[in-house]
């Protein structure tokens, strides 16, 4: 069985992120590979900026005083299709001020034709409603996420920048192979 996981890493190119991906992986290193990746620049009209964590230490206190603020969320929905034995999943990124708002935004966009959109307890995440995972993305190993509203901003869809099978466990093949299109 293959275990899939979404990881958030920072680098000037994908090759720069390999040490972090290997270090953060919780399973066996043998067979560790990348299936796809995507650089995220904009979500829901907000530009995504990375700020060194040391420079962003004032944010939590500012957040407490000003009430809810826009945050970047990763949401994974699950549901069923009448013509399939497997559970259907769709995940993506949204900007919202609360977990409930993030869930509502995701459900309005994804798996509209699925039945019984629901929550799986596979990850042990204390989710809200019918969402598998609804996690705020506040920081990534030494970096904080800063959102800047940009009117008429181009959206970043989740079409991969690259996809295929790229082993990063130290065994061949290396380097990253060309994608099959």
Where are these regions (language model features)?
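Extended intrinsically disordered, low-complexity coil regions enriched in Ser, Thr, Gly, Ala
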Residues: 1-35, 84-122
């Amino acid at each position: 069985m293959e275990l899939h996981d979404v990881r958030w890493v920072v680098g000037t190119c994908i090759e720069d992120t390999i040490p972090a991906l290997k270090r953060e992986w919780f399973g066996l290193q043998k067979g560790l590979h990348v299936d796809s990746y995507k650089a995220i620049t904009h979500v829901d009209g907000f530009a995504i900026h990375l700020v060194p964590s040391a420079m962003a230490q004032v944010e939590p206190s500012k957040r407490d005083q000003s009430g809810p603020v826009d945050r970047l969320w990763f949401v994974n929905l699950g549901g069923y299709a009448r013509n399939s034995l497997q559970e259907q999943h769709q995940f993506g990124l949204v900007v919202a001020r609360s977990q409930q708002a993030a869930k509502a935004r995701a459900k309005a966009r994804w798996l509209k034709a699925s039945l019984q959109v629901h929550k799986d307890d596979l990850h042990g995440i204390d989710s809200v409603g019918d969402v598998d995972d609804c996690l705020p993305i506040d920081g990534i190993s030494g970096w904080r996420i800063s959102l800047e509203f940009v009117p008429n901003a181009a959206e970043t869809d989740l079409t991969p920048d690259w996809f295929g099978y790229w082993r990063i466990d130290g065994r061949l093949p290396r380097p990253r192979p060309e994608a099959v299109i």
